[in-house]
Amino acid sequence: MRREKKSRAYRGSRTHGWGRVGQHRKSGSRGGRGLVGYHKHKWSWTVKYAPDWYGKHGFTRHPSLVVEYRTINVGQLDAEVEEFFRKGLASREGDAYVVDLTQLGFNKLTGSGQVRNKIIVKVPVATKRAISKIEAQGGRVEVAKTQEAGE
């Protein structure tokens, strides 16, 4: 003999446990449709769960002041410099490769990786570590601005 009902789906019950017909219809039971009422009747919810919902927070720098760095590290540059030369994106000056990184779409040279080739690099921004690694192989970096680590 079955002790529990086969289904708990309120078969034959018109309102399925929601009382009168209108009590589970449309948005009245939720206090409005969508993101409504957070500064009115749902204020206690806002205070508890979304305290930063209203007001200004922080600031946005003017786009002209924000520089988006497209970086390449010296290891990547060293690995690809011969390919750049084959494609005509770099030239030779004696035994050194000459690369203008702005023409390749980069505006910053960072110091990660190893340098095996002698490279002369033209770039707007370079880290001191990148400059020292390039110069250790007899190359040089023609740079507008140097950066400390973490800048």
UniProtKB/Swiss-Prot annotation:
Keyword flag RNA-binding: yes
Keywords, in A-Z order: Ribonucleoprotein, Ribosomal protein, RNA-binding, rRNA-binding
Biological role stated in the UniProt entry: Binds to the 23S rRNA.
Comp. bias regions, Basic residues: 1-14
Highest classification ranks of the organism: Archaea, Thermoproteota, Thermoprotei, Thermofilales, Thermofilaceae
Pfam families: Ribosomal_L27A
Region (Disordered): 1-33
One BP term from GO: translation
Family: Belongs to the universal ribosomal protein uL15 family.
Name of the protein this chain belongs to: Large ribosomal subunit protein uL15
Subunit structure: Part of the 50S ribosomal subunit.
InterPro entries tied to this protein: Rbsml_uL15_N, Ribosomal_uL15, Ribosomal_uL15/eL18, Ribosomal_uL15/eL18_sf
GO terms for cellular component: cytosolic large ribosomal subunit
GO molecular function, one term: structural constituent of ribosome
